[in-house]
Amino acid sequence: MKPIARALISVSDKTGIVPFAHRLQARGVKILSTGGSAQLLQKNNIGATEISTYTGFPEMMGGRIKTLHPKIHGGILGRRETDATTMAEYNIAPIDLVAVNLYPFEQTVAKPDCDLATAIENIDIGGPTLLRAAAKNHAAVTVIVDPDDYERVLREMEANGGALSSSTRFELAVKSFEHTARYDATIANYLGALTPNGEKSAFPRSYNIQFAKKQEMRYGENPHQRAAFYVEQPPPAGTIATAQQLQGKTLSFNNIADTDAALACVKAFREAPTCVIVKHANPCGVATGINLQEAYERAYAADPVSAFGGIIAFNEPLDPTTAKTIIKRQFAEVIIAPAVTTTAQEILTSKPNIRVLACGEWSSQTAAGWDYKRIVGGLLLQDQDTDTVPLEALQTVTERSPTPQELKDLLFAWQVVKFVKSNAIVYAKNGRTIGVGAGQTSRVMSSQIAELKAKEAGFSTQNAVLASDAFFPFRDGLEAAAKAGICAVIQPGGSRRDKEVIAAANEWDMAMLFTGMRHFRH
């Protein structure tokens, strides 16, 4: 491969472009550039030739047409041997490197005050055309769309006499096509969500999203299934997608799915140190405490059998005392927290197979995004189930109101039940779960399982509270809970037989709250 002799630079994101161009110039590379990029380079003593000077054709239409010229695209697309005669005939010089990034369409339309006209003006035309041309002809041209690649390209040029390997050019070309695909997908999503009268729908006519492969796995949910882990571009902070693995074996398919479930649940608790232990995507123990150690001990005690080999999630940085308690008490597949102190990390190294993750802090203001459910031949798309019921919106429907402690436990249980597979019943007392009934086709059966779990763990269900993810269709489910000693219930309400269920609660002197919000989870 011949050394790079001529480069075209046209960037919206000017991060690192000046030192990059300086080093290209030092290697004798001739630089072509456009508008603001050319001005910046010239201001920094870089001899960049403006495109309009090079082509003899001015920029026009307010900058809409800059690089759409045969002398530019011929220089990029020309096959160095096959098209050499044509290039010479029309005085088209080869362009060996294209460094381009695009108008910030995604950032522009994310602004609340962005109107359609502004969005349209931020649709880049020349940039994607340059990138696609350079990527297509990667056999002869290096294309750079990401400022993070400048240093890598320069190092390879310095090591190879100014040239780049075919493998590097191919990799950068693929990256360029991925970038333009995502760019066009963002435009299509934005415009496709607009109605003819200018209103915006939450759901575009076609839905386009790009995920980048982060990890290939030994297998999927089961050993006979192939699998890989893909993450959104860009992935949201404070998630399994961005978590840093501090130690342990490679995360498996099931590890990632279960850790995501545990993290989603623990994020719902912001006011006290909280621990969530998950098994097969269902919380088996959730508890708050005065510190993380107490929260963990209480969550573990809620279901010690199920906690074995589970996923442990915390809403605060993991400290040494809690880390020591965990490794003395149980085997865990994964521990995840916003951060892990240095001493806690040192303690955990005594159990090198435990996967320890630091996911970073999360913000309650961070957009939750979409929930995807794949079906054969399609995709179901919905909001994440992150809505909460304001305290003032809770409706006491029984003769007796909950006591302050009952109310506190009801709100705690209500936060947990939305993360349990339907039909879901959660028994709770004093800020922790004591029994979880998950995934049953009968709500009565889920309640019975929750009671059984509580008794197996040595808890009394007397004066515990119950949360149900959906309404009780009949009074029998409520009566079963009352017989177990449940003193207060929180549920959505909305059954045709609500009056019968309320009557049953009154007969047993139970307090019951209606939330008006269902939390099915499938």
Curated annotation (Swiss-Prot):
Query: Does the keyword Transmembrane helix feature in the UniProt annotation?
Result: no
Q: Which SMART domains match?
A: AICARFT_IMPCHas, MGS
Q: Which UniProt keywords apply?
A: Hydrolase, Multifunctional enzyme, Purine biosynthesis, Transferase
> Gene3D superfamilies, from UniProt?
3.40.140.20, Methylglyoxal synthase-like domain
Q: Which GO terms describe its molecular function?
A: IMP cyclohydrolase activity; phosphoribosylaminoimidazolecarboxamide formyltransferase activity
- Report the SUPFAM superfamilies cross-referenced here: Cytidine deaminase-like (SSF53927), Methylglyoxal synthase-like (SSF52335)
Query: Residue limits of the MGS-like domain?
Result: 1-145
Q: In which pathway does it act?
A: Purine metabolism; IMP biosynthesis via de novo pathway; 5-formamido-1-(5-phospho-D-ribosyl)imidazole-4-carboxamide from 5-amino-1-(5-phospho-D-ribosyl)imidazole-4-carboxamide (10-formyl THF route): step 1/1; Purine metabolism; IMP biosynthesis via de novo pathway; IMP from 5-formamido-1-(5-phospho-D-ribosyl)imidazole-4-carboxamide: step 1/1
Q: What is its EC number?
A: 2.1.2.3, 3.5.4.10
Q: Catalyses which reaction?
A: (6R)-10-formyltetrahydrofolate + 5-amino-1-(5-phospho-beta-D-ribosyl)imidazole-4-carboxamide = 5-formamido-1-(5-phospho-D-ribosyl)imidazole-4-carboxamide + (6S)-5,6,7,8-tetrahydrofolate; IMP + H2O = 5-formamido-1-(5-phospho-D-ribosyl)imidazole-4-carboxamide
One Pfam family from the record: AICARFT_IMPCHas
Q: Which GO terms describe its cellular component?
A: cytosol
Keyword Transit peptide applies: no
What's any GO biological process attached to this entry? 'de novo' IMP biosynthetic process
Domain free text: The IMP cyclohydrolase activity resides in the N-terminal region.
Protein family (similarity comment): Belongs to the PurH family.
Q: What is this protein called?
A: Bifunctional purine biosynthesis protein PurH
| The organism of origin for this protein | Nitrosococcus oceani (strain ATCC 19707 / BCRC 17464 / JCM 30415 / NCIMB 11848 / C-107)
Identify the gene encoding this protein: purH
